[in-house]
Swiss-Prot record:
Disulfide bonds: none
Name this polypeptide is given: Protein unc-93 homolog A
Organism whose genome encodes this protein: Xenopus laevis
Family that this chain belongs to: Belongs to the unc-93 family.
Keyword tags: Glycoprotein, Membrane, Transmembrane, Transmembrane helix
Gene: unc93a
Lineage: Eukaryota, Metazoa, Chordata, Craniata, Vertebrata
Length: 460
């Protein structure tokens, strides 16, 4: 059917695009490590994404529609791949800004397209719109989530040609790897000093750029245009909702529960930023070589996807508090272990155990924090999730921003401190909810007693 065809086209378009971007993101701290250029570009991306989320999507979608917004935004992502061919401050930072400004319209247009398609199909078939939209999003994420596997697999297969079997054996000094890695120091004799050849880097970037171009062609040629309903296009409608959205996002901070959740939301950005920006460079690249970054991140992506599905179901039986505690304990244990561990190539399996545990914990942070926002702020979901995106993105910006100035050990202590603050503040939120539910229950019982008393008096 036409609707499913369009959903599949959008899904595979995003798969192709994020196969390229996801792979590049994992490699930035290792591939463009000079003066911290790689992580600086990632910080700029998320900073631009914050600004873009507030100002750009409604205007662009209104002007050119969902389909062509997706196409134009995908072209913004391709510029980042092109900028990596001649990586410098004059190429990567501008292309990072372009990507960041294109990111918010891309996701907004995708969500609008899938939602509108689901609503129209439900109307036509007389079904519940909510059920159809959920099915469409489920299909999309089923396909999209595998991009983390393919992008990293491609990079490891290509860069693996640069490292003959047994090439690690001649390196013995790894004292500067792991928590001991500091700005301005080299990796000693670790394998991280061996960079892939230019020809291999260009091959990888060529594959990634080609993947992005294929995504654009797929959407531009095969995706059907969907016209937004007339009431959505009336003059002033978007501008009004746009200004209201900004005010609602700011006003939502008056809710003390939202303020208490800021550290937890920012921690999501901190922990993801550490794994992709610091673990990949200071542990994996330094000790094993850049060709293993992809394999390690595949382990994270696969565990994350499986656990996201698992914990989404498990939360019905355990409740969210137990899962949050599990994630906090897992992350805290990993951070402490990373502070103490001296990474050597002989500890090969350990390099994969950390991202596997991290992926499990991240699955809890993502699924349960989103669910928590949905439950706590049921009547103000749009403002709540706007705050969620804002504070998580800010966490990314800070994590990538200080990456080039601090030792890994300091970054691990910061991560642990933010985690502890986040969990304590989250505990206050749960306490407030418990008190609120207790009051509501007492009020209900009191009303029932008054009602029974009134009935008895009437009977007399």
């Amino acid at each position: 059917m036409k609707e499913i065809k369009n959903i599949l086209i959008v899904s595979f378009g995003f798969l192709l695009l994020f196969t390229a971007f996801g792979g590049l993101q994992s490699l930035q701290s290792s591939l463009n490590s000079d003066e911290g250029l790689g992580v600086a570009s990632l910080s700029v991306i998320y900073a631009a994404l914050i600004v873009s989320s507030v100002f750009v999507p409604p205007i662009v979608i209104k002007k050119i529609g969902c389909k062509w917004t997706i196409v134009a935004s995908m072209c913004c992502y391709i510029t980042y791949s092109l900028g990596n061919f001649y990586a410098s401050w004059y190429t990567l930072i501008p292309t990072s800004l372009i990507l960041g400004f294109g990111g918010a319209p891309l996701w907004a247009a995708k969500c609008t397209y899938l939602t509108e398609s689901g609503n129209r199909y439900a109307e036509k078939k007389g079904k519940l719109a909510k059920d159809i939209v959920n099915q469409y999003f489920g299909l999309f994420f089923l396909i999209f989530q595998s991009s983390g596997v393919w992008g990293n697999l491609i990079s490891s297969l290509i860069f693996g040609q640069n490292y003959p079997a047994g090439s690690n054996d001649s390196f013995t000094d790894y004292s500067q790897c792991g928590a001991n890695d500091c700005p301005g120091t080299n990796f000693g004799n670790g394998t991280g000093t061996t960079k892939p050849t230019k020809s291999l880097i260009y091959t990888l970037l060529g594959v990634y750029t080609g993947s992005g171009v294929l995504a654009v062609i797929l959407i531009a040629v095969f995706l059907d245009t969907i016209n937004l309903r007339t009431d959505q296009l009336k003059p002033g409608t978007k501008e009004e909702s746009f200004s209201k959205k900004i005010l609602a996002t700011v006003r939502h901070l008056k809710d003390k529960r939202q303020c208490l959740l800021i550290p937890l939301t920012m921690y999501s950005g901190f922990e993801q930023g550490f794994l992709s920006g610091d673990y990949t460079k200071s542990y994996v690249t330094c000790s094993l070589g850049i060709h293993f970054v992809g394999y390690v991140m595949i382990c994270f992506a696969a565990t994350n996807a499986v656990c996201s599905l698992l914990f989404g179901q498990l939360s019905k039986y355990t409740g969210r508090i137990c899962l949050f505690i599990l994630a906090a304990v897992s992350n805290a244990a990993c951070v402490i272990a990373l502070l103490l561990w001296e990474p050597y190539p002989n500890d090969f399996a350990v390099f994969f155990i950390f991202p596997a545990i991290w992926g499990m914990a991240d699955a809890i942070w993502q699924t349960q924090t989103n669910a928590l926002y949905g439950v706590l702020f049921d009547e103000h979901k749009e403002a709540a999730f706007a705050n969620y995106r804002l504070w998580e993105s800010l966490g990314f910006v800070i994590a990538y921003g200080y990456s080039t100035f601090l030792c890994v050990s300091v970054k691990l202590y910061i991560l642990l401190a933010v985690l502890l603050i986040a969990i304590v503040f989250y505990g206050f939120v749960e306490y407030l909810e418990h008190v609120e539910h207790k009051k509501a229950a007492s009020t209900t019982i009191s009303q029932n007693e008054d009602s029974n008393s009134l009935c008895k008096q009437t009977a007399m």
